[in-house]
């Protein structure tokens, strides 16, 4: 993993850990970035954690995220990890999440802001070789509109990733004040 990727992962863990540590229940499901599920969900207090990913791995489900083989009103927590921006059917995904979540369940959406430096990098992706996510980035306002249509209540919006998409660890350390100053 690149220095930038490691930095973003640590920032994400810092934001997710308090949320996951206060979420209780029987079932959680992470959709997207299956390789990071174990690390990101370490603080999760939900009893059974599943990930949409490789079917040959323990606790991984292989399915279409817009047609999950999960009972309605049965999941306490869903984490959409960079998935809305990498699907052609974001509305269908959100409808399916709404279907499987219990009435007081939590949905955590993790994605890049199209108006950020990462979003600008996405805009120039045709000239860049190693862009990690090549989908369509949606604004927080657009996602909030979709959520309201489905009946979700948004409690919190956190932003991370104020650093530019750079690879030099020394430059990342020197610019870390951007991340702290924007909170």
Model-predicted regions and their roles:
Residues 76-91:
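A short SAM/SAH-binding and catalytic strip from SAM-dependent methyltransferases
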Residues 1-21:
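Class I SAM-dependent methyltransferase Rossmann-like catalytic core
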Residues 91-106:
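A short glycine-rich, Lys/Arg-flanked "PGG" loop and its adjoining helix->strand segment in the class I
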Residues 66-78:
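A short acidic, Gly/Pro-enriched loop at the edge of an enzyme's catalytic core
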Residues 124, 134-157:
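Short alpha-helix
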Residues 106-134:
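Conserved class I S-adenosyl-L-methionine
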Residues 159-183:
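A C-terminal cap/extension of S-adenosyl-L-methionine-dependent methyltransferases
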């Amino acid at each position: 993993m690149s220095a930038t990727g490691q930095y973003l992962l640590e920032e994400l863990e810092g934001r997710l850990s308090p949320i996951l540590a206060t979420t209780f229940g029987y079932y959680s499901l992470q959709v997207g970035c299956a390789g990071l599920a174990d690390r990101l969900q370490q603080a999760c207090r939900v009893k059974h954690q599943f990930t949409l990913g490789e079917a040959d791995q323990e606790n991984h489900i292989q399915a279409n995220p817009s047609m999950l083989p999960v009972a309605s009103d049965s999941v306490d927590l869903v984490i959409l990890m960079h998935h809305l921006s990498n699907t052609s059917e974001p509305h269908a995904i959100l409808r399916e999440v709404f279907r499987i979540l219990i009435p007081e369940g939590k949905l955590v959406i993790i994605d890049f802001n199209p108006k950020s430096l990462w979003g600008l990098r996405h805009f120039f992706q045709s000239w860049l070789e190693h862009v990690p996510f090549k989908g369509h980035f949606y604004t927080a306002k657009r996602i909030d509109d979709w959520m309201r249509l489905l009946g979700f209540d948004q409690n919190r919006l956190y932003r991370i990733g104020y650093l530019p998409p750079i690879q030099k660890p020394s430059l990342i350390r020197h610019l870390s004040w951007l991340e702290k100053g924007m909170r």
